[in-house]
Amino acid sequence: MAEFVRAQIFGTTFEITSRYTDLQPVGMGAFGLVCSAKDQLTSQAVAVKKIMKPFSTPVLSKRTYRELKLLKHLRHENIICLSDIFISPLEDMYVVTELLGTDLHRLLTSRPLEKQFIQYFLYQILRGLKYVHSAGVVHRDLKPSNILINENCDLKICDFGLARIQDPQMTGYVSTRYYRAPEIMLTWQKYDVEVDIWSAGCIFAEMLEGKPLFPGKDHVNQFSIITELLGTPPDDVIATICSENTLRFVQSLPKRERQPLKNKFKNADPQAIELLERMLVFDPRKRVKAGEALADPYLAPYHDPTDEPEAQEKFDWSFNDADLPVDTWKIMMYSEILDFHNVDANAEQAAHNNDTVAG
């Protein structure tokens, strides 16, 4: 039985196993406080995220279960890696991942990025997205603060709390406004993996320019700013709008022509502009795919088709339409955590056996 210890962080009780020491607050995640800690087992620095009261409502239980399942399933160099997970006696959940020193938002607010860093960061974002999308997952909330970076410039995408199934009927409204794809704002009816490519394009533009490309004050202003640069949406995109109010709003806007991006980004590499043009396209069906973008000439210094893996299997979304009581989600969550620790223990045992044989 694990021994739990308590610590007070910003007035919040962290109740964690004695394996983790030296807790220091590093920020707030989407649904909880994040601390750095030292893992006594591995001597590595880790991030510990507290998800408060995951069993308080069926909606929160389901969301927590979804993030847990995703973190278990997604295993890739450019995706944050789950190293431990447990539920405390107070029934809060703690998710332990590797700790990276900073995030892209902090980097962008501290100094302009040199060309080779912009290329390398964009390459890693797209490499991660190629894998995520091949698993049948859409991140939906890609933004600079969800992109973690270490001192070696290794990059990892995090915060899959809002991620959803690839579904042509996907609904709702999610990501931070500046990075939100127009089809989310326009239709509220259906969107797919292309929303992440739009977000990545906005992040790419911000790396080139040093400031957000579309800093809208609200949804209406956001869309207006987008059309100033990219022009009025084509008729076949407007035809997909389901909401009468949204349709009237779009039709009321003055007709605008798409502006050449090279006029906006005067100092940027022409190849960077060409790739950005392929990412920031109104029609999601014509937006470049992650795998195609990786093969773009701009990313040639890093592109290696033999080292840009796809997921071995699709993520199982069968639970996603379930409307279950808290107690059922709780049993399912405990089952997933037990499975994670069993798989982990078996992998360690296999590695130990191999070492013994090799020795």
Curated annotation (Swiss-Prot):
Reaction catalysis annotation: L-seryl-[protein] + ATP = O-phospho-L-seryl-[protein] + ADP + H(+); L-threonyl-[protein] + ATP = O-phospho-L-threonyl-[protein] + ADP + H(+)
Keywords linked to the UniProt accession: Activator, ATP-binding, Cytoplasm, Kinase, Nucleotide-binding, Nucleus, Phosphoprotein, Serine/threonine-protein kinase, Transcription, Transcription regulation, Transferase
Phosphotyrosine PTM sites in chain numbering: 173
Sites of Phosphothreonine modification: 171
Motif TXY, chain ranges: 171-173
Domain (Protein kinase) ranges: 20-299
Cofactor: Mg(2+)
The protein's enzyme class: transferase
Maturation and modification: Dually phosphorylated on Thr-171 and Tyr-173, which activates the enzyme.
Regulation: Activated by tyrosine and threonine phosphorylation.
Enzyme Commission designation: 2.7.11.24
Taxonomy, superkingdom: Eukaryota
One BP annotation, GO: stress-activated MAPK cascade
Extent of the signal sequence: none
Coiled coil location: none
Family: Belongs to the protein kinase superfamily. Ser/Thr protein kinase family. MAP kinase subfamily. HOG1 sub-subfamily.
Domain notes: The TXY motif contains the threonine and tyrosine residues whose phosphorylation activates the MAP kinases.
Protein name: Mitogen-activated protein kinase HOG1
Organism whose genome encodes this protein: Hortaea werneckii
Annotated gene: HOG1
